[in-house]
């Protein structure tokens, strides 16, 4: 039973860490905002399945 509580505690801590430190590469940007978003990264805007993809110039 103690192991079960330890596993649950570890999972909860990992969830909190992932919430606090999100993956910086994953940014959901709509196609309308894509050109502005990619211009800040000096990249070319491209929409792929309604997701913004910035291609290096």
Curated annotation (Swiss-Prot):
- How this protein is processed and modified after translation, per its record? Contains 3 disulfide bonds.
Q: Does the keyword Magnesium apply?
A: no
Indicate where this protein resides in the cell.
Secreted
> For this UniProt entry, which residues form the secretion signal?
1-19
State the superkingdom.
Answer: Eukaryota
Key word Secreted present in the record? yes
GO CC term, one of those recorded: extracellular region
Residue ranges of the propeptide: 20-28
**What role does this protein play?**
Selectively inhibits voltage-gated potassium channels rKv1.2/KCNA2 (IC(50)=331 nM) and hKv1.3/KCNA3 (IC(50)=503 nM). Partially inihibts rKv1.6/KCNA6 (IC(50)=9983 nM).
Protein name according to UniProt: Potassium channel toxin alpha-KTx 8.8
Its organism's taxonomic lineage begins at: Eukaryota, Metazoa, Ecdysozoa, Arthropoda, Chelicerata
